[in-house]
């Protein structure tokens, strides 16, 4: 586990069983001025997030916000898909099934372009799917997910014990979705509608095809502009 | 002037590695991350990790292929690992060879796998030599001008 650059605003937890890939993702994230913590397995990630037991932490019960408090404050999780033991998909399910962690955006990385896998991850709550090797341009896409969460954050901060699905919060998320949509951001926040997921899928698949000769200086502007624009 | 000559040598080596397809734009990205991040040892660290890892994996595969009954799934898992590491450092040629190798694993062909292993090994040794020369040149350049990198 390595912690670097504690000054920066967003803290990303990177999960990968390959040391080379951990080095790479850490470097990419550091270069994009994120605070980074890396771990080599899904179970270590959950441990770090304060979710220890194997049992279901009863996400259905609204009063379960206290038992699994977060050990460290993580703004986003980026995980490899293919890992021994707990896969990235398993980790995603655990995070999304936890009342205290479910709002943390999860991004999945994989070296294999398997459409069924990509869809499954996106439909089950992953924000994004990156094909490996991950590029600097991919890091820019993370910002939009982090900023979206920021918009929702004040409510959570004001009332941390609030049950996750109170009507007013749902309304607020809906408003945020509408706001995000009008602001031309990557509209969908928590629910992966078909159009949203296929758009992201397309973006992910595009990565293998696109390869501009001057990537060194201008990394893949095409994929960032294809439906993933953030700035307004 | 000696430092400039070494730099020319390094540039020539790197461009030949690209033109031969040994490395791809992912490797360029590592260099860019190193230069922009102000972390001089990054490429060296990742390349060294890759070489150690690849060497270990190739030996594991060789051992598996010597068994009387070959566990092709296990071989495939190792080749997949090697392919991933190669992709991450931009070792394009090794990566492509791994992709062909996986086909032989799926066909459960020992002869095919042994042939692919020989090719992967050859490609990897070739790349490792170049990487080693690259790192040596970088060290020599830095010795001339420690403030440069």
Curated annotation (Swiss-Prot), chain A:
Keywords: Cytokinin signaling pathway, Nucleus, Phosphoprotein, Transcription, Transcription regulation, Two-component regulatory system. Gene3D superfamilies: 3.40.50.2300. GO terms for biological process: cytokinin-activated signaling pathway; phosphorelay signal transduction system. It holds the Pfam family Response_reg. It is found in: Nucleus. Residues 153-174, 202-232 are annotated as: Disordered. Expressed in roots, leaf blades, leaf sheaths, shoot apex, flowers and panicles. InterPro entries: ARR-like (IPR045279), CheY-like_superfamily (IPR011006), Sig_transdc_resp-reg_receiver (IPR001789). Coiled coil: none annotated. Residues 11-147 form the Response regulatory domain. It comes from the Eukaryota. The modification 4-aspartylphosphate is found at residue 80. Two-component system major event consists of a His-to-Asp phosphorelay between a sensor histidine kinase (HK) and a response regulator (RR). In plants, the His-to-Asp phosphorelay involves an additional intermediate named Histidine-containing phosphotransfer protein (HPt). This multistep phosphorelay consists of a His-Asp-His-Asp sequential transfer of a phosphate group between first a His and an Asp of the HK protein, followed by the transfer to a conserved His of the HPt protein and finally the transfer to an Asp in the receiver domain of the RR protein. GO terms for cellular component: nucleus. Induction: By cytokinin in roots, shoots and leaves. Residues 209-232 have a biased composition (Polar residues). Belongs to the ARR family. Type-A subfamily. Functions as a response regulator involved in His-to-Asp phosphorelay signal transduction system. Phosphorylation of the Asp residue in the receiver domain activates the ability of the protein to promote the transcription of target genes. Type-A response regulators seem to act as negative regulators of the cytokinin signaling. This is Two-component response regulator ORR4.
Swiss-Prot record, chain B:
InterPro entries: AHP1-5/YPD1 (IPR045871), HPT_dom_sf (IPR036641), Sig_transdc_His_kin_Hpt_dom (IPR008207). The keyword Cytoplasm applies. Disruption phenotype: Dwarf, narrow leaf, small grain and low fertility phenotypes. Keywords: Cytokinin signaling pathway, Cytoplasm, Nucleus, Phosphoprotein, Sensory transduction, Two-component regulatory system. It is found in: Cytoplasm, Cytosol; Nucleus. Pfam families: Hpt. This is Histidine-containing phosphotransfer protein 2. It comes from Oryza sativa subsp. japonica.
């Amino acid at each position: 586990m390595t912690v670097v650059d504690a000054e920066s605003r967003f803290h990303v937890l990177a999960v990968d069983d390959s040391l080379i890939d951990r080095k790479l993702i850490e470097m990419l994230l550091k270069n994009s001025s994120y605070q980074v913590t890396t771990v080599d397995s899904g179970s270590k990630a959950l441990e770090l997030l304060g979710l220890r037991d194997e049992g279901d932490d009863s996400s259905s019960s609204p009063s379960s916000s206290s038992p699994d408090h977060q050990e460290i404050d993580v703004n986003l999780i980026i995980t490899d898909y293919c890992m021994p033991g707990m896969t990235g998909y398993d980790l995603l399910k655990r995070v999304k099934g936890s009342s205290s962690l479910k709002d943390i955006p999860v991004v999945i990385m994989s070296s294999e372009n398997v459409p069924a896998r990509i869809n499954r991850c996106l439909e089950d709550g992953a924000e994004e799917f990156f094909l490996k090797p991950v590029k600097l341009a991919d890091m820019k896409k993370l910002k939009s997910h982090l900023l979206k969460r920021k918009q929702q954050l004040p409510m959570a901060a004001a009332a941390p014990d609030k049950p996750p699905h109170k009507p007013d919060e749902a309304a607020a998320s809906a408003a945020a979705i509408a706001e995000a949509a009008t602001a031309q951001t990557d509209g969908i926040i928590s629910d992966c509608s078909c159009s949203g997921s296929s758009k992201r899928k397309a973006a992910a698949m595009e990565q293998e095809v696109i390869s501009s000769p001057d990537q060194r200086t201008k990394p893949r502007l095409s994929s960032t502009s294809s439906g993933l624009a953030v700035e307004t | 002037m000696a430092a400039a000559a070494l730099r020319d040598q390094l540039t020539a080596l790197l461009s030949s590695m690209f033109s031969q397809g040994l490395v791809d734009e992912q490797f360029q990205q590592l260099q860019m991350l190193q230069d922009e991040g102000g972390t001089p040892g990054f490429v060296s660290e990742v390349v060294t990790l890759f070489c150690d890892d690849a060497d270990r994996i190739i030996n594991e595969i060789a051992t598996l292929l010597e068994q009387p009954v070959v566990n092709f799934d296990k071989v495939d898992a190792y080749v997949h690992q090697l392919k991933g590491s190669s992709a991450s450092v931009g070792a394009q040629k090794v990566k492509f060879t791994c992709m062909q190798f996986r086909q032989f694993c799926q066909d459960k062909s020992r002869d095919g796998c042994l042939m692919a292993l020989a090719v992967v090994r050859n490609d990897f040794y070739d790349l490792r030599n170049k990487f080693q020369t690259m790192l040596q040149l970088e060290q020599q350049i830095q010795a001339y001008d420690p403030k440069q990198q």
